[in-house]
Amino acid sequence: MKRFTLIIDGHNFFFRSLWSCFRQSSKTKILSTQKDIDAYEKKMMVDFCSVVKSVSPIVNDIVFIKDSHSWRKDLLLEHEYKGNRKKTQDNIDMLGFGEAVNNFTDTLVNFGIKVGQAERSEGDDLIYAWSNFLFESGKSSLILSTDKDLNQLIKCVNGIHIIQYSPVSNKLYVSKESNDIIKSISEHKEVQMENLFDELFTISIENDPFEKFVKGTDIEEVSPEEIRFAKIIGGDSSDNIHPVYFKRGDGETKSKGIGPKTVKKIYDTFKGKLGCEFDYHIYSNEDVMKMLCNIIYEIAKIKDDEFTKRMLLENIKTNTKLVALTDESIPADVIDNMVGNINEERLKKSVILSKITRENIFAKSRFKEYKSNIQFDSGTVRGAKGCDMDFIVG
């Protein structure tokens, strides 16, 4: 199997490193001192080296994705989109956080790592743009993130893969087609190999690095279109996106929405009536969307005089823009910005992965020298708490 380009979800990476260092406290604001900023920056460099080492046998290039101000926050009010995350951020000095992650990103640039960053582009958008560009160029991608929103990008066509790896759960998310190939490897079937100088594996199946990697992971087969559909219709509570039908409770009555089981019934019924291959293009077909509205009304048993099918259709359109990662759902200017970033960064030579060591990374940073003893002003904890981990997604 061909080697992958490793695409690292920077936002996800930043907060995994953060919560592996600091314990949330109502008394002490983290990253409010230079000592904490320095320590956090060093921790990210150490974690980056560890991440690369863990997947280096199966990758031959790296793209590190960094968020910018999201166009989605311009589409909805700031307090609505991802507004439920602000309480978690209250305990973080965001100026200190910004200084640390910017310094860390500068270190990656100094080292020659490709960095995906573009104006108005959220990390998910850039991961879509980069993985799609690589896919169309005949190159496979390994997305490193715990964010299940990115499952919608997973696919495999003609042996070109987009798969996702969660380092927290040690889980590999793959399409049915990718999983079939993995199963064939585990059954020790012949794998077509190409020239080693093209950085493809030409060795026996017993020594195949990919086989060794997947043997140490849990594999979950996912349906990208079903995941995208579920987030559009059922919303995404982690991003504060409501279902396409949602009525907030008034204290005496409970809030009403569309739960996962109902979304599944809607999906199965819609897929059965569609009569053609199910992909993201359907969301731009108004007649098909009207059919979907009728199915939602029927299965969700919506009886609300204040809620019309026209409102439902508009909610589907809005959620599609917020949730779906496609050229159709992302604004044209954002696409142009990301294409510009790709065209610039792809000209960089691939970094030799064996050179990504703590000593070499620190040498390119403002610290210049690696020291194993990293100290913090705030309390530290080895491994993040469950409540902390909720914030790293998205």
PLM regions: where:
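Common nucleic-acid-contacting/processivity interface regions adjacent to the catalytic cores
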Residues: 394
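Accessory alpha-helical DNA-binding modules that contact the DNA backbone or grooves
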Residues: 192-336, 348-377, 385-391
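Noncatalytic, basic helical substrate-engagement surface that gates or grips nucleic-acid strands
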Residues: 2-144, 149-180, 187-189, 324, ...
